[in-house]
């Protein structure tokens, strides 16, 4: 986890699913799929990633799964995997992306977990804790199935009206994130217009936005001068543009993903172990309509990338979708410098909080 240490308004961080009620066809069971495809050659670009996103389909015992969920969710996540790689490449990190546990090049291994309780135990507000407890128990009993510390947990809608899906947890907490499934959650519906197309953008875009949180990213906004070409930031309001108009990773999101376990090409034993960092000097100046920030830090683990956010009031939490941001590599072993042109800010009035991570 990234560890934040407050220094006035700045901080430094190391970026370092079966039950009788289900509608799933028995031929979709993981064992059957694995057996059928045991000789398949997987050529997915990120198949060699040593860590892979755990994708879980969690079904409360009084809710039905949604037909064809494996194929639909596989296409959505494979598309996102490629989109992330294109953005990482643009930001100078090569075509890195999150690993997926694949049955073949078009199908993801999705863990199906039947909940011990009904949907009332897993509400939107606060229900993630009960879900996560059962997911942890599942991986405790199946340790080889766990491919990383990162979980995407998808829960079928509690409301069976396809025009009004909702009910389960839908947010990111720590290295896990939660999203929902419903009958029209299908990549083919992105951009088709009408209510079906709009809801596909909201719920698919929302899933990928929450996945970003589950991969350690925070909210931010595309800098103003980049918006005409890069569009909307995924980790800003990209859940309302995904599949309709250009939606991109910002430089800060890409830098964060560069230090995420499931993007790594090497194994480590200390992922998200306790870390400490401190800014020991910080200075700023203003020249040529540009805010210049520089400083030095100490840390007990290597630092690869540093990010600064300028968040206009109200600050933080779910009020930071409008935070413009910059990312940079460290200078030497302990220094950083940012240049933040005013042309990249959308509103030059009011108060801002600066955060460094």
What are these model-derived regions, one by one?
Residues 66-67, 191-201, 222-223:
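Active-site rim elements
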Residues 15-18:
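C-terminal motif of bacterial Sec signal peptides marking the signal peptidase cleavage site
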Residues 201-218:
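Active-site recognition of the HExxH zinc-binding catalytic motif
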Residues 2-10:
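Sec-dependent signal peptide recognition
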Residues 28-150, 155-167, 314-335, 341-343:
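Propeptide-to-catalytic entry region of secreted or membrane-anchored zinc metalloproteases
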Residues 162-197, 240:
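Active-site scaffold of zinc-dependent metalloenzymes
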Residues 20-26:
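Bacterial lipoprotein signal-peptidase II cleavage site
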């Amino acid at each position: 986890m990234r560890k934040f240490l407050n220094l006035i308004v700045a901080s430094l961080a190391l970026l370092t699913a079966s039950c009788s009620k289900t509608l799933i066809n028995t031929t979709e069971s993981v064992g059957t799929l694995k057996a059928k495809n045991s000789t398949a050659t997987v050529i997915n670009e990120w198949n060699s990633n040593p860590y892979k996103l755990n994708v879980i389909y969690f079904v409360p015992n009084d809710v039905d799964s949604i037909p064809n969920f494996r194929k639909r969710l596989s296409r959505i996540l494979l598309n996102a995997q490629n989109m992330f790689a294109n953005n990482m490449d643009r930001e100078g990190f090569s075509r890195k992306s999150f690993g997926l546990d694949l049955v073949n090049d078009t199908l993801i291994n999705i863990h199906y977990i039947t909940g011990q309780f009904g949907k009332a135990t897993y509400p939107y507000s606060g229900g993630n804790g009960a879900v996560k407890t059962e997911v942890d128990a599942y991986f405790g009993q199946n340790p080889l199935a766990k491919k990383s510390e990162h979980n995407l947990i998808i829960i079928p809608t509690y409301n069976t009206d396809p025009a009004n899906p909702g009910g389960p947890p839908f947010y990111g907490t720590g290295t896990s994130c939660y999203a929902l499934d419903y009958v029209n959650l299908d990549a083919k519906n992105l951009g088709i217009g009408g209510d079906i197309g709009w809801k596909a953008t909201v719920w698919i875009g929302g899933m990928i936005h929450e996945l970003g949180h589950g991969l350690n990213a925070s909210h931010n906004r595309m800098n103003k001068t980049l918006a005409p070409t890069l569009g909307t930031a995924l980790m800003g309001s990209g859940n309302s543009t995904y599949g309709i108009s250009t939606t991109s990773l910002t430089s800060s999101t890409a830098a964060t993903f560069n230090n995420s376990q499931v993007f790594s090409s090497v194994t480590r034993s200390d992922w998200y172990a306790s870390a400490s960092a401190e800014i020991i000097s910080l200075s700023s100046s203003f020249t040529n309509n540009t805010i210049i920030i520089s400083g030095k830090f100490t840390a007990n683990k290597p630092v690869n990338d540093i990010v600064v956010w300028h968040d206009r009031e109200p600050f933080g939490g779910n009020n930071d979708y409008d935070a413009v941001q910059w990312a940079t590599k460290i200078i030497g072993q302990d220094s950083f410098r940012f240049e933040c042109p005013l042309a990249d800010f959308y509103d030059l009035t009011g108060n801002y909080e600066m955060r460094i991570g």
